[in-house]
Every structure is written in structure tokens, then in C-alpha cells.
Amino acid sequence: MVKLAIDMMGGDDAPGIVLEAVEKAVNDFKDLEIILFGDSSQCTLEHDRVEVRHCTESITMDDEPVRAIKRKKDSSMARMAEAVKSGEADGCVSAGNTGALMSAGLFIVGRIKGVERPALVVTLPTVSGKGFVFMDVGANADAKAEHLLQYAQLGNIYAQKIRGIAEPSVCLLNIGTEAAKGNSLTKKAYRLMEDQHDFNFTGNVEAKGLMNDVADVVVTDGYTGNMILKNLEGVAKAMGKMFKSTLLSSFKNKMAALILRKDLNGLMTKMDYAEYGGSVLLGLNGTVVKAHGSSSAKAFYSAIRQAKIAGEQEIVKTMKETVGTENE
């Protein structure tokens, strides 16, 4: 049985989409228990495997992250993180303030001993629909080469345990594929990754090749990763608008869109971030999943499923044994 703590109040459309996603999750997974943290008066869900714990505070998107976590002790997010820290819950999911959730992860759940910098990881779509693990996308703007090496180790475990890839290929994001390319950070990181035997390092990858299935895991610093992620989101939205405008521009195009509707829906599903769940803060003493702030019920459900798999696969235990220093 896996038990997850859920922030009922986080996100643009909470608690509605959260309750819808939780209801579907407990109905689909008979080995899942949920603790919902939030305003109990707004909870309309009743289920024998769902417990509701009333919180008098909530953290908004406008709150200063660290201050909010430290001052709002009875917020749904802080209480949720405490449940993970105490071991009562195997993991947690929130669509709330990203910075606050990262602060809750660091200051409440805590880092795995030996992990210098936790990293924020996402799974992004590729042309084949397989997707790839990408990190760090914003947990740390600055990074040392040793941090990138740890990111690669964490990402390798994530790809194995969560995505079911037996021997993931791991690449370093760079301005060229040659080993000598890049700045001092990427050159040193390349040497460190090349010298290790913990994962299958296959070299550098350029940004233009990210979505072409060249690697299962791609590693970079949080500053670069966050810009890449936001650029991909922006391009995807712009292309969607252009595509829609073209399809609706004439009767001929509208007829073509009608004929191709099933194929177009399949393409959109392949590229839909909701299929892959949320972003995960790796390197902590518990699973912390961040669903998108504007998540639909479908996207939040995927994030719950993601956290459940992490609990089943004991991903935190594996990271402690592989990357951590607790057993040394």
C-alpha cells in the first residue's frame, strides 16, 4: 500500500481539479491511500481510503516562498511536507507555489545526506512519443560540475524506476556534440561523467536535438534548463496558435482538419505534458512532485500516478544507496 499526501489548496483551479483527480486515482488504484490537506469545508469527496485533514492556512502564488513555509505552519503545503518528513506518507503532490514547494522540500522534507543540490526534473515529449528526462529545470541557477554529475546519477535512477528504462542513455546539454566543446563547467562535467561507471554516458547533445530521441536523460544547470523549458513551452503554444489559425483560415482547410481530426488528436496526445505527470524534486528524503499550476484533473492525476510509482519502486531508498553517503 502506498500513502500519498496531497495539497488540496494548491493550483489555479483547486480544490476542484484536485478532488476530481484524487477520486479517479483511488478508484483506479486499490493499493493507494490519500491524505488530503486543506480547508475541509471545501472537500466534497468521501472515500474509505481518503483522509481529510483541516488546515487553517494556504500558500498563494504571490507569497514569498521561504517566508511562507516558515510562517504558515498550518498551511496545506507545509502540513503535507511534514507528513512526508515523519514517514507517514511515502510522497506528496502539489500544484501550488513552485518556490514554496521547493522550500518545503529543502527545509521540511530535507536532503538526502551526500546530495549537495537537489534537482528539479521533468519528462518532456519527443517526436516518437517516448519522451526524455530533463534536469535541472530551475532548482539551482548555479551549479558545479560535481553537481551535474550527481544530477546524472539521480536522473539515471529516475529513468530506470519511474520510466522503466533498463539502461538509460545519459547526455550532457552543450553547444556542440564534441567532447572539447562548451565552457569550463561543461568540459569538467563531461570528464567526470566519462570517468564514472554508474550510468551509460553517451556524450553531449545540442539543444536542437533534444526532442529527436537522442537520449533518455539530459542534464544541465538550472539556469539553462529553465530557459530551455520555458522556450519549449512558448514555442509549443505559438505553433499551436499558428496551426489552429491555418486550419480555420478557409473552408478547404476546415474540411482537411475534419478529415484529419483523429490523427491530429493523436499528435496532440503525444505532445501533451499531462501524459507525463509533474516535475519532481530529486535528492530529497521523500518524493515531492510539483504539478503544473494550471493543471487539469488529467494532469494532476498523472502527477499522483507518478508519485505512486516512486513509492512502489522505493526510488528514494535507491538514491540513498547509490548517491547518498548514509551507508558509507
Curated annotation (Swiss-Prot):
Disulfide bonds: none
Keyword Methyltransferase part of the UniProt annotation: no
EC nos: 2.3.1.274
Name of the gene encoding the protein in the UniProt record: plsX
Pathway participation: Lipid metabolism; phospholipid metabolism
HAMAP family attached to this UniProt entry: PlsX
Key words, A-Z: Cytoplasm, Lipid biosynthesis, Lipid metabolism, Phospholipid biosynthesis, Phospholipid metabolism, Transferase
Source species: Staphylococcus saprophyticus subsp. saprophyticus (strain ATCC 15305 / DSM 20229 / NCIMB 8711 / NCTC 7292 / S-41)
Enzyme class: transferase
PANTHER family xrefs: FATTY ACID/PHOSPHOLIPID SYNTHESIS PROTEIN PLSX, PHOSPHATE ACYLTRANSFERASE
SUPFAM superfamilies in UniProt: Isocitrate/Isopropylmalate dehydrogenase-like
InterPro entries recorded: FA_synthesis, Phospholipid_synth_PlsX-like
Any GO MF annotation of the entry: phosphate:acyl-[acyl carrier protein] acyltransferase activity
Role this protein plays: Catalyzes the reversible formation of acyl-phosphate (acyl-PO(4)) from acyl-[acyl-carrier-protein] (acyl-ACP). This enzyme utilizes acyl-ACP as fatty acyl donor, but not acyl-CoA.
Catalytic activity: a fatty acyl-[ACP] + phosphate = an acyl phosphate + holo-[ACP]
One Pfam family cited in the UniProt record for this chain: FA_synthesis
Record's subcellular location: Cytoplasm
Main location: cytoplasm
Superkingdom of origin: Bacteria
Assembly and oligomerization: Homodimer. Probably interacts with PlsY.
Protein name: Phosphate acyltransferase
Record GO biological process: fatty acid biosynthetic process; phospholipid biosynthetic process
GO CC terms, sorted: cytoplasm
UniProt similarity note: Belongs to the PlsX family.
